[in-house]
Amino acid sequence: MSTGKIIQVIGAVIDVEFARDNTPKVYDALNVVEAGLVLEVQQQIGDGVVRTIAMGSSDGLRRGMEVKNTNAPISVPVGHGTLGRIMNVLGEPIDEAGPIEYTEKRSIHQAPPAYDELALSTEILETGIKVVDLICPFAKGGKVGLFGGAGVGKTVTMMELINNIAKEHSGYSVFSGVGERTREGNDFYYEMKYSNVLDKVSLVYGQMNEPPGNRLRVALSGLTIAEGFRDEKRDVLMFIDNIYRYTLAGTEVSALLGRMPSAVGYQPTLAAEMGALQERITSTKTGSITSVQAVYVPADDLTDPSPATTFSHLDATIVLSRQIAELGIYPAVDPLDSTSRQLDPLVVGQDHYETARAVQKVLQRYKELKDIIAILGMDELSDEDKKIVDRARKIQRFLSQPFHVAEVFTGNPGKFVSLKDTVASFKAIVNGEYDHLPEQAFYMVGSIQEAIEKAKTL
């Protein structure tokens, strides 16, 4: 094990000098023994000097400190021992529940599976959330992105998806908290504990207060644990909150390493870094990884390079809209902007496909008529258009739904609506079977039966 010494410290970037014939490889993990800190090699500068990124706080480091090369990349424990535990980027427990028992450790840097090992799946995962199941269904082994600006409900929608799928799902789940609030990580842990599914979930946290090197690697640590379960012939759910913070950590690291920034100040390696992560989140013939990723949209601009780069990797995109959130409709999913590769008659069936398209057609027509209504009022519309507006407003309200995870805030018990009920209900609304009910009856209910009951009390 070769040793070197620190020659420069600039925030999270630390230069270490080794003997020329013992220069560490890129991605090797180095140990600063005295400070108990792990560094990861990012660049070889020459003359035995390597530039590294710290995985923890660099407070208290000084020049001349001894650094040991482990001759291997950062490795994390995989397997059953990680279930029910909270780990950091290095796979060390941070839940004060003793050491993690493991039989295997894996490097967090892995090559994606070979092309001939990949497997496709068209089996639909039922989420119990009406708007998701109807407009943007997702498949087992698929990748789903939850896009939204600040405060439109990404984390709550993701928690509901975890609640609904992880409880029904017999396999294991891995949750990677990348640069998010520590409070949310804490809430999530207790939510899982309360739901009795903690023994099927591995948690890896690198929250907002961590240095950029930590946040850049914590998604890979979580993914490595998920790959471990997949290679044991299991179906795994992988949740990442938030992919944007992964990109942002890359931007910080890139600037610290002195790279020239590209568009909007992002790192020049944005597409490559995103690809390295996303290409590994895939299903093979042994098992599947179904991933749900929250993606923060800076200033509600979907053309920003970070969300735009993420789009190309996903099978389904759930776009949360501030305009819909302002109407008090939650989940604030935009049914005209959200898409899914699975919304195909060959996958979901003709009935589901036609109902979803009919719903979108009615909502699109309502959107076009809004300007006319604003200027001239409802009375100037034709009878046909008046009907469309009436149905669209009912559909819009019926797309709202009380969540199980939000019950503590709203006092409304959460509702799980089966896919069959969802399709039948929307089909009936589009066909005008509920034209006689007031639109308020459709707001924040589960099934159509509840809307009928609610109408009686109005």
Swiss-Prot record:
Taxonomy, superkingdom: Bacteria
Family affiliation: Belongs to the ATPase alpha/beta chains family.
Subcellular location: Cell inner membrane
Matches recorded under HAMAP family: ATP_synth_beta_bact
Any one of the GO CC terms: proton-transporting ATP synthase complex
Organism: Francisella tularensis subsp. holarctica (strain LVS)
Keywords tagged on the record: ATP synthesis, ATP-binding, Cell inner membrane, Cell membrane, CF(1), Hydrogen ion transport, Ion transport, Membrane, Nucleotide-binding, Translocase, Transport
Catalytic activity: ATP + H2O + 4 H(+)(in) = ADP + phosphate + 5 H(+)(out)
A GO term, aspect molecular function: proton-transporting ATP synthase activity, rotational mechanism
Lipid bilayer topology: Peripheral membrane protein
Signal peptide: none
InterPro entries, per the entry: AAA+_ATPase, ATP-synt_VA_C, ATP_synth_F1_bsu, ATPase_a/bsu_AS, ATPase_alpha/beta_chains, ATPase_F1/V1/A1_a/bsu_N, ATPase_F1/V1/A1_a/bsu_N_sf, ATPase_F1/V1/A1_a/bsu_nucl-bd
Function comment: Produces ATP from ADP in the presence of a proton gradient across the membrane. The catalytic sites are hosted primarily by the beta subunits.
Binding site for ATP: 148-155
Family annotation (NCBIfam families): atpD (TIGR01039)
Protein name per Swiss-Prot or TrEMBL: ATP synthase subunit beta
